[in-house]
Swiss-Prot record:
Name this polypeptide is given: S-adenosylmethionine:tRNA ribosyltransferase-isomerase
Enzyme nomenclature, EC number: 2.4.99.17
Organism classification: Bacteria, Pseudomonadati, Chlorobiota, Chlorobiia, Chlorobiales
Keyword Flavoprotein among record annotations: no
Native source organism of the sequence: Pelodictyon phaeoclathratiforme (strain DSM 5477 / BU-1)
Family (UniProt): Belongs to the QueA family.
Highest taxon above the source species: Bacteria
NCBIfam families to which the protein is assigned, alphabetical: PRK00147.1, queA
Record's subcellular location: Cytoplasm
Pfam families: Queuosine_synth
Gene: queA
Keywords of the record: Cytoplasm, Queuosine biosynthesis, S-adenosyl-L-methionine, Transferase
Biological processes annotated in GO: queuosine biosynthetic process; tRNA wobble guanine modification
A GO cellular component annotation in the UniProt record: cytoplasm
Length: 341
């Protein structure tokens, strides 16, 4: 398949630039992946589409302070966003502005060196001193809202670009399918008999970068660390034998479960099942684990859009997106959601 098959026109007014006034007050488009039928609902009514015995899997990662502003000797401001958290001396960053190899930057009296330009808008940065780049971001960094929002982070983002069940720090982007999940909705689902459990996948900004290769087979996928509790593996095995459904809340959960799918079959013990998900899911992929997917409306040419198309079917997803655009749904991280079953 070609990357252009996943392009569509997304105008600025369709992008949700801010979270809704109240968490969970967004819309929900429900798509039947077998028939292509579409139902318009609200996110708060998700319980109507779940059944007793279903297993809801959530990502409990917490977003780091991963956005930092630096300046060049000319005074030009450069925005830096961590692509992943490592304990290395050098880290890859997504940048906005003009940089070249050898440039020196200043960030809060700390000198930085651009050691390499890796790709379009991606550089490798080193700190000229004893402090690590991760430490610098942790001390001075801000909320890493996505670049496509085209604004600086504000106070509202500190709370709303984090899920209500965020626990383990490590992500440089939020698992956005869960941003509208509320404690009240989770309680409603529990009362209905829906089981729920968390895994951890630390999200890198590479998740949201567009695919630049013309042929999907030429795209090199980024890696993201994940940890799946042994209890979740057992719950999945049980659900698969009792007729329940494994419901992935987000593409991050999907990537972790599908990457670990083959190992789950023979996994034993109490230790978590860990790995680095570098799986690239696009149409033609045969899903092993998940039965339903709760996700947002994604950017054109993105790997998360391709994953969603693989699960829903390209034609069904294309039709659903067209209806969502016509009906005024809000797109991307702070926008409305889809439930695909």
């Amino acid at each position: 398949m070609r990357t252009g098959d996943f392009d569509y026109e997304l105008s600025e007014e369709k992008i949700a630039k801010y979270p809704p006034a109240e968490r969970g007050s967004t819309r929900l488009l429900v798509l039947n992946r077998h028939s292509g039928a579409v139902v318009h609902a609200s996110y708060a009514s998700l319980d109507l589409f779940l059944q007793p015995g279903d297993l809801l899997v959530l990502n409990n990662t917490r977003v780091l302070r991963a956005r930092l502003y630096a300046s060049k000797s000319t005074g030009a401001r450069i925005e830096l966003m961590l692509l992943e958290k490592h304990q290395e001396e050098q880290n890859r960053v997504l940048y906005r502005g003009k940089l070249k190899k050898g440039d020196k930057l200043m960030a809060h009296d700390q000198e930085l060196l651009v050691t390499d330009i890796v790709d379009h808008g991606i550089a490798r940065i080193a700190v000229c001193g004893e402090r690590s780049l991760s430490d610098l971001f942790e001390r001075f960094g801000g909320v890493p809202i996505p670049p496509y929002l085209k604004r600086d982070a504000e106070e509202v983002d500190r709370e709303r670009y984090q899920t209500v069940f965020a626990e383990l720090p490590g992500s440089v982007a939020a698992p956005t399918a869960s941003l509208n999940m509320t404690s009240e909705l989770l309680d409603t689902l529990r009362r209905k008999g829906v089981d729920m459990v968390t895994l951890t996948l630390h999200v890198g900004l590479g998740t949201f970068l567009p695919v630049r290769a013309d042929a999907l087979e030429e795209h090199v996928m980024h890696r993201e660390y994940y940890s799946i509790p042994a209890t979740l593996v057992e719950k999945i095995r049980k659900v698969k034998t009792t007729g329940g459904r494994v419901i992935a809340v987000g593409t991050t959960v999907t990537r972790a479960l599908e990457h670990a799918g083959e190992r789950m079959e023979t996994f034993t013990g109490d230790a978590p099942l860990t790995g680095e998900a570098d799986i690239f899911i696009y149409p033609g992929y045969q899903f092993r684990i998940i039965d339903c997917l709760l996700t947002n409306f994604h950017a054109p040419r993105s790997t998360v859009l391709m994953l969603t198309a693989a699960f829903a079917g390209p034609d069904h997803l294309r039709n659903a997106y067209q209806k969502a655009l016509e009906e005024g749904y809000r797109f991307l991280s702070y926008g409305d959601s889809m439930f695909i079953a």
